[in-house]
From Swiss-Prot:
GO MF term (any one): tRNA (guanine(46)-N7)-methyltransferase activity
Keywords per UniProt: Methyltransferase, S-adenosyl-L-methionine, Transferase, tRNA processing
Active site residues according to the UniProt entry: D125
Pathway per the UniProt entry: tRNA modification; N(7)-methylguanine-tRNA biosynthesis
Species of origin: Nostoc sp. (strain PCC 7120 / SAG 25.82 / UTEX 2576)
UniProt-recorded name of the protein: tRNA (guanine-N(7)-)-methyltransferase
Function in brief: Catalyzes the formation of N(7)-methylguanine at position 46 (m7G46) in tRNA.
Keyword check for tRNA-binding: no
Residues that hold S-adenosyl-L-methionine according to the record: D47, E72, N99, D125
Protein residues bound to substrate: K129, D161
Gene that encodes it: trmB
């Protein structure tokens, strides 16, 4: 139970959602930023694939001088997450139901320049089969959308418990000239953020590795 939040009915959802299915091909409408946040000109942290949204829910409380936007393709989870946010009275947090692979441009194009300063993509669906690789969230087009709107000096934090997923995500960002990898090692040993995701905590408690990397918007 999250402190200050009354119990909500548990929402059961499909673990895997095909982002190429017809129902997910319509891009999200632009946000009315002034209605979504009490202080819309604070720096924005975008969490792509936020699931139940617990990570950004905690981040919004730890970093009240930032705004947080969680994107999730499973609508029932977004409804639940926004209920939690409302119960806590957080005005620097918003969740949006959308397919990130076709919605970043219409969402972020209305942001003032320099507002988007941090992006996280954590433990995305691995889509193990090669024929399903196009369903993985980190595609070259998504990387370019992030490059178009992330402030120079802004960062992208990636992590997964599947090494092949982490490698593919890193390869996609490394292939874009707008990004440079931070650090000299292949993987970060520590999470640079003050909050861990539930999946991260569970994985580490089992003694299993988490593959992390940080990229900076360089030009």
């Amino acid at each position: 139970m999250i402190s200050g939040v009354s119990a909500l009915p548990f929402v059961r959802v499909r673990q895997h959602v095909n982002p190429l299915a017809q129902k997910y091909l319509t891009p999200a409408n632009p946000l009315e930023w002034e209605k979504a946040y009490s202080t819309p000109h604070q720096p924005l942290h975008l969490d792509i694939g936020c699931a139940r949204g617990r990570f950004v829910l905690q981040m919004a409380q730890v970093e009240p001088n930032w705004n947080f936007l969680g994107l999730e393709i499973r609508e029932s989870l977004v409804i639940e997450a926004n209920q939690f946010r409302s119960q806590l009275g957080l005005t620097n947090l918003h969740y949006l139901y959308c397919n990130a692979n076709n919605s970043l441009q219409p969402l972020l194009s209305s942001l003032p320049t320099g507002i988007l300063q941090r992006v996280t993509i954590q433990f995305p669906d691995p889509w193990f089969k090669t024929r399903h690789a196009k369903r993985r969230v980190v595609q070259p087009e998504l990387v370019q959308d992030i490059a178009n709107y992330l402030a120079v000096g802004g960062v992208v934090f990636l992590q997964s418990d599947m090494e092949f997923v982490a490698v593919e995500m890193c390869d996609r960002f490394a292939a874009n000239p707008a990004f440079k990898k931070v650090g000299t090692g292949e993987w970060l040993t520590e999470n640079p953020l003050p909050v861990a995701t539930e999946r991260e905590t569970t994985t580490q408690n089992r003694g299993e590795p988490v593959y992390r990397a940080l990229f900076e918007r360089s030009s």
